[in-house]
């Protein structure tokens, strides 16, 4: 119990001193800087419940000699870190005394909790499916892995993808034991025993309730240990041969009613605010009671809430007994020690110790990215000579490449994660015949399913993302495929960046690879807005560039790769050799459509933009032969600039490519502000650049209609170029007016045809590059 109280105290210190570093003294109520206590109370209640379970798992796993992996929500960083920290402190060779160094060590803060606190405790993002999603990814193909998912009841009732267990095979995948902390004043805690069992049986589990609210703590410990042993036995029974397993294998799940010592403090404080009913009965402890108490406290105002916070924290501190954490000699001591076993502490012996301050080091087993045999690119290429004469769907060859890669890869070295947003289009058709992993009877969708399927799909894209993160953190490679208008990269980027920070410098984490179809301007900006994330967004100009890109993505490590293309049929411009050079360079001049001494530069980013820019160049040179135009292609961007993280574009290269004096018109499939920020970072004159941004939303418009409405079509680009060329005196005002009138007439033709036939005009769909032929 003393060990638990030490971790409670450390967690309390971290929570309460979030913005105030410890000054070398034990935590005092006066250190609290928060006016409202409700959020702090809820966090500490969850932290203390987690600390209780960590202690129980530690004792159980020590008895059988196993090395578990414990995954919990990142919001529980204070409890997880406190538990690991206190364990480090009690190790041999770590002499923590009742001094400033000792108290500072016990109250160590983490303002940026990473994903791994040790080789045992792992933190995850609740927005990506939480502990269960990442545990499911880690367990894929890892039969010997045992993972305990500690899930707070507030998270379990809303954000946990419970059906993910139906994707895992008991015979080939690792053991996952979900443990739900049933805290009072949460929705699940209001359910009766029958309702709880019925709920999780319906989810596909075999639940068992562990009641640890008894007065005798030894009985709680014994019940918890027995439940963990039962869960281990039930999992072992599911690993018998398939013909002996039940058709629907229900995995064990524990529902723990946690001790209420801490909750009693809450109830005692709230009892002063709650009134008795008319008949003298006390209002039941429920969600309604918690909401009523919260409303009452807020009505009292900030001053009284602050005062109650101080009084309440005084009770909590007294219960934690911080003054008894040290013995008469000033050393941290416990009457009963239940330490969480992990390899984070690497302390020297007492005779050789050179430091008296405990340090929590995140030491995880060295990861080695699984080698992956990738198919040759050439069989998937489209003939591209002369440029622009052949048309192909930009992502069709990518789908074929990935499907063959998944089929021929070594067992469990590669997985495809297909988002539910990918419902239509050529890319979706490429994966339609790929069997999805499924272990639970009837198929949940029209796509084929199989118990040995290696393609993962789940209705919640966030949970699928979390599963991918767990999978790659085991050193294995993967690709997430979805439609960009429905995906949000921010949570995945933050979680992956945190995972990178947790890895030792000697390890290489496989890249987080994503392919997004149906270009969304918001998602391009979203990916590039993550300034601290190691992100590269690829914009292939055609199908050959697109099929080269996955090969580059899968050969990289420690990077967030995003391939962003339109899933539409576009001309093919580059051979595979030229495509590879373009994608590696990130920014290049296309000589076949350029003049060496240009009067104006037209730049394209992505497949649709490339077609529109080249069509605009043809319009300009046909109407105004005297105009000298340069065509530039932008094939990759990072939050830091043009190019890739491995090969960024320098200021000198940018100036040489787009010139420093000539006007530049850019067609860009993202929000204008993101590209403007990139150009600003290069220190260029913003007046030189005219950005025509666009996005493709599923609004029912044809492609050309959508581009015209956003002033990003070939005709809008040609009009903008004519305006610039006329202003600089390259062409006469009559030539400029003639070109603009021609373009406006073409726009009217396209819009009229789309209104009548609901398709784009043939002069758009059958257009071919003619210059130089």
Model-derived segments and spans:
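Thiamine diphosphate
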Residues: 111-116, 130, 142-144, 161-320, ...
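Short alpha-helical segments and helix-capping/turn motifs at coil-helix boundaries
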Residues: 51-59, 65-68, 83, 119-120, ...
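Non-catalytic terminal/interface segments that mediate subunit docking, oligomerization
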Residues: 2-29, 33, 40-45, 49, ...
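Beta-sheet entry/capping signal
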Residues: 66-70, 146-148, 175-177, 206-207, ...
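Cofactor-binding active-site loop characterized by glycine-rich and histidine/acidic residues
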Residues: 29-35, 41-171, 428-430, 466-474, ...
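Acidic, glycine-rich active-site loops and adjacent beta-strand->loop/helix elements
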Residues: 74-77, 151-158, 181-186, 213-215, ...
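Conserved catalytic alpha/beta cores of large enzymes that bind or transform nucleotide phosphates
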Residues: 510-519, 528-531
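A glycine- and small-aliphatic-rich helix-loop capping segment at beta-alpha/alpha-beta transitions
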Residues: 85-93, 142, 161-172, 268-273, ...
